[in-house]
Structures are given as structure tokens and as C-alpha cells.
Amino acid sequence: AVHTPRKTVTARTVAQRSYLDLLRRHEVVFSVGPAGTGKTYLAVAVGLSMLRQGRVKRIVLTRPAVEAGERLGFLPGDMAEKINPYLRPLYDALYDMLPQPKVAAMLEAGSIEIAPLAFMRGRTLNEAFMILDEAQNTTREQMKMFLTRMGLGSRMVVAGDMTQVDLPMPSGDARSRSGLVHAMHILKNVPGLAIHHFTKADVVRHPLVGAIVTAYDHANTDSEKS
């Protein structure tokens, strides 16, 4: 279990329990699986716990800001208005564990930072708990850029779903460009790095979500056969 100000976050499946253990023991953890398995949510809980214990000085939450064929340039409004729709799920996880005024105060103080992945370029983040969400939508270059931001005393979680690659592709398979797919292939034997896989059996949203994931998996399998 992980204690946060608003609630105690507990593992609901064996795989989630194993994941929490990896998050506590490893400095870099890749977490892969379908939506609703707690990949990012549990990482945020562990990050908040480590922040409260003084094991890190800040939490940095990020995700690529290109999803489902949309680019920031085509969204209305100023930069804050443009990026907030992409970052909303990260705020939702925080608000579930912390009172909203506390989140606002921590954002103001810099102990929590939420930003698009592009804002990470050129930085070195020391004593930070870094979470990259929707990592399947990074390019190889973006993934390398993120992984090399890690400074002394930092920890890193890379979470994604390899069946939901939304990278725009001129031609060919979007999966082949995904930084997550590539990184997991070339980094699988790096000491100190852990890779954790969730399945649809670990979905902890509404019971129908698991059935929906299964139906789409079957549809994709059928289309590949035909």
C-alpha cells in the first residue's frame, strides 16, 4: 500500500503488487499494458510517497503533446490552453491523491511539475521522480532525449500502451517509429532497469473496460488474419 494525503493506494492485482515493488526498488522502470491498469496512477502514488519521505525533491510528470493526429499548432488559444488537454490525465491522478489547493501550492513551489515532453529538452533533472506517460507516442529521438535527462538521485518511470501508437506516419507502421517499442528492445538487458508488463486482466476501471479491450484485441487479430 502507498499512503497519500487523500487516500491509501493499494494494489488490486498481483501484477500491480509486483509493479509497486519494482517502482520502489529500481531507478528506471518501463511499464507497458492496456489502459486502466494503473501504470501512471501507481507511479504517481509512489512518487508522492517518496517526495513526502524526502527521497526526491520534486515530481516531474510529462507526456508527448502529439496524440491521435493532433498537433499543438492546430489547437486554439495560448500555450497553457493548448497543452492542458494533453496533460489533464496527469492532473486527474494528482487530484485523486491530494486536495486541489495542495496541488496548486506544490505546482507553484516547483515540487510538482507537469509539462509537455518538448519542455524537457536541454535539462538535467536531479533528485526528481520523473514519469513519462503515453510513452508509445514518443519518437525514438524523443525517448532518448527523455531518458538522458536523468540526473543524480533521480528515478524514472516510462509508461505506455504499445497497442495505442498515435504517431503520424507518412507511410508504414507507426509502431516501428515508437520510441517506447525501440527503447524496450535495445534496453532490455541494461542492469538496474526493470520492464513490467500488464495485461487486460489487470484493468481496474469499470468492469466493461476489460471487455472492451478484449473485443478490440480480437478485432485487431481478425483484421490481421484477413
Model-based region annotation:
Residues 1-3:
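Charged, amphipathic alpha-helical linker segments immediately N-terminal to NTP-binding catalytic cores
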Residues 6-14, 18, 22-132, 136-226:
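Conserved helicase motor core of SF1/SF2 NTP-dependent helicases
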